[in-house]
């Protein structure tokens, strides 16, 4: 039974109130209101709140993170927490309530410590029983004792046994931006703490600086009622420990999905490649075979690594994202993104490294997926780019943004091939996501080009050599109403030689800013979980001959392209273009074109073809497409 207490016993330091317009809170609200949460998370929390009580669980015992959840839930119309266990929120209470808390606190000083604690726990349990949401703090790790967390979970278990509604504990990731953690400790980190275990001062400074990049991600909730039924034969102490560990683990999974693993520097990754045992053996064997000094072969390997390796820097990514946001708004009419597909990518990224394999239509592809992943709170991949894109300044910018460069052809150069293969293997070993274009170059016609399976074979070989336990190959469709290279593509299809990419071309292409290129479409295919896929083959890859392995790589390449085709869409522009091209005379009336387009649409519908989301308003979509043609 939950104890009843007198009037003063309802004022505690952790209390939060449904008043956010008092003067002390308003300046903080300027920064707090910048914190974002995706609409799909808001919808899922609203649905969850109709089924039972929501308890928000965060890792650090942080007043700031408690305030972020407090303001965000108020702004989004979600269940507002009325209590933050273990955090002193008295400064953020309205003045009358703060004065009452101070008086109650003064009176409690004359009580025995144990009685005061029991009163506080009874208040918290009463709050839970009244179906009022609260915030609990889990601590940094399940292996580090947290009496506050154990008290909160114990109280939740007690209340769950007394009420007729389920309690949902929602683990919440609160992050102030997308910066990856570095393995090397800087002086700043030594003084103020790493991003994860930071002190109060650095947390506040970091939040103020990056508040416009801060976000909240609720992880998969735990239904406490179901959890207790599943673990009814275990000791409560064990249940509390394991439940706390599970909640912390779910927050860590979300963090990994967004930020990725701790990142080593370019030099450290290169050192790992050169010190790899199979790499060292290759260098020794190749030196003997080619009758060269081992030092010479190792020097060549290091030189190739410098040519290949990415040099990821957060600052460049942050600047680049701002430029790309402006570019998309200037050149395109919006991005149509497969949010369900992106959720699949997020779920995969929590469990294993993943390899994004998109079709290739435009140089914009290099930038687009990284931008979409950033905005979708998914860790950005390291992108395999051709050396044709390594010209200054774009090559420098791409390399700093996570691109690594490879030659179009390196047949006969065994050292280069081994270095590239081992670099990819080390990236996978570090749990870093990759991206490469299976067609090799850009398709000039919009149709899929025959797959090139060189990089795919290197990635599968890295898995086979145990550099990673598993990985997912994720096919991605990227479609454009118009590509910015349309003029050069027409020239090439008419017989003109391909012009090599250079700085002058970038300057000349500035006139694209005067045009609109319609929408961009991104759809995610079904991920191929490579371990399961390879185990399902009649013959295991270890038992295959070289020819059989190459045949398998080709098969996987074609299956990836088939999956990309499955999720490709008919766009309004492509439908209108087909209608215009089907007409054999020079001019066509609007009514006649409309009849043709309706006929095409009905035919494609009967064939179960996927249409772009913009077809939800078909007449407007076709009108917009016609406007692009008459620019």
Give residue spans per PLM region.
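Membrane-interfacial terminal anchoring regions of lipid-handling membrane enzymes
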Residues: 1-631
